[in-house]
């Protein structure tokens, strides 16, 4: 196949998808600057991981949880095979961008014989270091004929994993635990969907032991109507503790004539009372624009599951899935994000009421 360049009578062969991605990055960088606030900046080498990088057969690689362990960046990547089933595989890098060392086989494979909720795979991990446990807690989606649900696992080295089992009934996903307790309770953000529900909202729940969860609250509502986050919303990476509050990056979905469109927005929660929403962006802040975000197994998707804050310089690295087909990287400055949120409206505080179900 050949591509004719507009500025040249010659034709140039398309070498591979990566070269197209690089050219697209250059074209995007040369566009007239947006008049909107642009805080998230794509890495010029995007996508940083694809199935072509994998040491064993894989259909797609995307939606990676992320953490910093010493001098090493660790991604726990969702890998989908040609059956459509997913597992999780560890990739390690010294700079968080290149020279990834990828496990030679699945690091966290479904175990349907012992955990029937994983019959169709394990997906979309979020990683949280919980200091009082001295371990990483992985919140992931277990998928089976009963529907998706939230399960937890723990690890200290990303070589061995201990399952804590399912903690929410179907249908539920987009979960992550907070890194510390509130009083004597752990807290978790997640996104349940009930039969006949009018929308898919972000919820907050509490637990004394990471096993038994209750005191459920709706944290953020899908806004319906013409809003960019009208139809459903869900947590993206885990909550990030900042001096100003818990920083939340969430995805919002709007149903369009061309299908579902996933974009990202921001919120800020009170440090000591995470049920209290201090700020929420009215505008989306990051959306599918590049070919690797707009075209893939699921078109029009940017879906972060992990981010890493460099406390020395305030830089945030956001690792996201592009079109359910690759792993990409964007960066932002924490000060810019918090500064923007301070200009956003404070949402009305609803009367808090503990819930026993998600109806």
Locations of regions flagged by a protein language model:
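Beta-rich carbohydrate-recognition and catalytic domains
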Residues: 2-7, 17-120, 129-176, 180-231, ...
